[in-house]
Amino acid sequence: ADAPNFLILSNGFEITAGGTTVGNNANGNLYTYYAFASDQSAAPVLADSFANKLYNGTGNELTVSGLGFQPSMSWLKTLNAANEWNLYDNVRGPFNKIKSNTTSAQETTGALSGFYIDGFTLRGSGYSLNQPGQNNISYNWKANPIPTINTDGTIQSLVSANQASGFSIVQYTGTGSNATVGHGLSAAPELVIVKKTSGVQNWMVGATVVGWTKYLELNLTNPAATASTTWNDTDPTTTTVSLG
């Protein structure tokens, strides 16, 4: 039977793991990264892959619908109150939020309780992003409703991918050594965003336009910095992202 740390996948199962060391590839740590690329052989259909949606909080259980697809990742922010940016995805599971403006580890007390065929549901009273009088925005991406075990890299990963739109959600456990991680897309990602979910760490960003010898930090205002220990000075390939 399923348990909170046991995930049924389209091609197997995954037992989640975690650790305490900082970094984007530290030994024993659990991470999620988001990879973006396009499939030149399959034209993306924007209406079927991404949608933003405004909604008003109610304080009661709320269904946000009208996306036109089942989202795999939702990024939520209150517009008229000082709440943090909350990010949810179907690889880490409902309730598990990471906050893109902070260094915080994943929290299991999030408002989003599930994804469904046309949107998502939110818990009621006591949760930000669904309070009476609050106006909120959601940005929603479609990947795969059922994550898949990926063995393309030297580190096994858990992937939810939409090759047509060039978007994937990837979870992996760091080793502390140079490694590669499969992203599930059919083209090399041009943008990769990584967050350590098992502990405190800045959000690491890699981009082709910046160069893969450098990195940015999503939650900070710092300029691009150079470090071979981030992407191992290696461009992503059509199957993997490199880690230093």
Say what each PLM segment does.
Residues 1-244:
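Surface-exposed molecular-recognition determinants
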